[in-house]
Amino acid sequence: MTIKAILTDIEGTTSAVSFVFDVLFPYAARHLPDFVREHAGEPEVAAQLAAVRAESGEADADVERAIAILLQWIAEDRKATPLKALQGMVWAQGYRDGQLKGHVYPDAVQALREWKARGLDLYVYSSGSIQAQKLIFGCSEAGDLGPLFSGYFDTTSGPKRESASYARIAGAIGLPAAEILFLSDVVQELDAARDAGMRTLGLAREGGSLDGHPTVASFADIVVE
């Protein structure tokens, strides 16, 4: 089947893992406590704090305890949805203030633009919140790349290493899974996408291969047919 849509991961694929771990995560860890204290009474933040209490099993946690739980989750690199949402809010403020610029590899920028011009639909699937995804591409070093994408998916669609998540995403996109190409640097994610019927391509930017999947080192090496 002809590829009609491309679904891409972010970390290690379109963007450097170091940007997320060396820039975004430390920025959120530094600014999240004060952000939560300042905005705890606002509905959007209050809803996420309620989710923190529910997920941690600490129904009576006050704001300071909730902050401590969030910082612990950051230290554990836990993919908790309320943490991702609050990190996204902190990053949004940082992008608005000009303190952050999203990193996207130049080869990815060029390929994404070319694919869009050819009429391919582009989508993102990342463990980072949809809000955070939009910020990385919308406030990137290459400018606003947001208009290139037709949609974004995060952990609300399911874990990235489970095939059901990819079947769900294919349904949301409205195409047979076989007409969607998934790009990632993680074998288990590629396996899950393949099990759901998607075409897969691995990104190994430092060289090497991703077992069981065609692998390239750069978006410049990707041929979409």
UniProtKB/Swiss-Prot annotation:
One Gene Ontology BP term is: L-methionine salvage from methylthioadenosine
Record's keyword terms, sorted: Amino-acid biosynthesis, Hydrolase, Magnesium, Metal-binding, Methionine biosynthesis
Quote the cofactor binding remark.
Binds 1 Mg(2+) ion per subunit.
Which Pfam families does the UniProt entry name for this protein? Hydrolase
Enzyme Commission number, as recorded: 3.1.3.77
Q: Which reaction does it catalyse?
A: 5-methylsulfanyl-2,3-dioxopentyl phosphate + H2O = 1,2-dihydroxy-5-(methylsulfanyl)pent-1-en-3-one + phosphate
Cofactor(s) the protein requires to work = Mg(2+)
Q: Name one GO molecular function term.
A: magnesium ion binding
Top-level class of the enzyme under EC nomenclature:
hydrolase
Q: Which pathway does the UniProt entry assign to this protein?
A: Amino-acid biosynthesis; L-methionine biosynthesis via salvage pathway; L-methionine from S-methyl-5-thio-alpha-D-ribose 1-phosphate: step 3/6; Amino-acid biosynthesis; L-methionine biosynthesis via salvage pathway; L-methionine from S-methyl-5-thio-alpha-D-ribose 1-phosphate: step 4/6
* UniProt similarity note: Belongs to the HAD-like hydrolase superfamily. MasA/MtnC family.
Cross-referenced HAMAP family: Salvage_MtnC
Function (record text): Bifunctional enzyme that catalyzes the enolization of 2,3-diketo-5-methylthiopentyl-1-phosphate (DK-MTP-1-P) into the intermediate 2-hydroxy-3-keto-5-methylthiopentenyl-1-phosphate (HK-MTPenyl-1-P), which is then dephosphorylated to form the acireductone 1,2-dihydroxy-3-keto-5-methylthiopentene (DHK-MTPene).
Q: How does it assemble?
A: Monomer.
Q: Can you say what this protein is called? A: Enolase-phosphatase E1
**Species the sequence originates in:** Pseudomonas aeruginosa (strain UCBPP-PA14)
